[in-house]
């Protein structure tokens, strides 16, 4: 059973959605899931898979990005449709206190171990939550190394938008043109140490005539960039159009 626990995060506005904490089990990682309180539409809620960076975990977006508060506010303001957001732990090693955990995480990243788990994770989530099966309502995004994982999983997830926030990418893993391509929604800080890599990616996408949106914002490679970008990303992917 996926609903193993419920964490209520205090917010400055009336609580609407919940953060559901899912423990690691059956070879799948721990996850935090934002679930809206609104009535589920007939075709299911839109769904976003949202990944943390190499030093974070599955609670990073809820804590530092204030996911529940942000989404509650946007839904209350009728700025976006209600959406389910899945925030998994993106590495196979779960001990935060091991001395070399950054190195083992990097090893996981290079070998694509989370990517190997993801199809099973996705099937479990979408078989347990009432989410839309239409690719136009499925999205994937990540920050820093999580952006690399999101890019690698874009085809597996069959999503319509890939969010790349301060992406740290391997050029050999750049996407290739195909008949149906997602929109690559990219944002990075003006002072980000990896800004040059973002520019290189944009030039590549231009050359390949692949759809993308690129935004530079004030800040570096940190939550001062990622937290404010999240609501803009959500308004871009699930704007409320049936007013």
Please annotate each region the language model reported.
Residues 13-243:
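Non-catalytic cap/lid and distal C-terminal segments of serine-dependent acyl enzymes
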Residues 1-9:
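Bacterial N-terminal signal peptides
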């Amino acid at each position: 059973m996926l609903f193993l626990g419920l964490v209520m995060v205090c917010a400055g506005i009336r609580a609407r959605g919940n953060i559901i904490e899912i423990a690691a089990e059956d070879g799948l990682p721990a996850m935090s899931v934002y679930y809206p309180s609104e009535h589920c539409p007939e075709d299911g809620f839109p769904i976003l898979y949202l990944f943390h960076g190499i030093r974070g975990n599955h609670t990073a977006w809820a804590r530092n990005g204030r996911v529940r508060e942000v989404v509650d506010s946007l839904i209350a303001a009728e700025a976006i449709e209600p959406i389910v957001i899945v925030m998994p732990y993106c590495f196979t090693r779960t001990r935060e206190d091991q001395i070399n955990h950054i190195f083992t995480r990097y090893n996981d990243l290079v070998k694509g171990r989370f990517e190997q788990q993801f199809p099973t994770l996705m099937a479990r989530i979408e078989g347990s939550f009432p989410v839309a099966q239409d690719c136009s309502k499925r999205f994937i995004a990540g920050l820093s190394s999580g952006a690399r994982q999101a890019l690698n999983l874009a085809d597996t997830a069959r999503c319509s938008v890939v969010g790349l926030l301060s992406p740290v990418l391997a050029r050999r893993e750049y996407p290739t043109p195909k008949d149906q391509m997602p929109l690559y929604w990219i944002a990075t800080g003006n002072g980000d140490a990896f800004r040059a890599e973002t520019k290189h990616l944009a030039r590549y996408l231009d050359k390949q005539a692949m759809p993308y949106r690129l935004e530079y914002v004030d800040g570096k490679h940190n939550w001062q960039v990622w937290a404010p970008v999240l609501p803009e990303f959500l308004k871009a992917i699930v704007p409320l159009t049936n007013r």
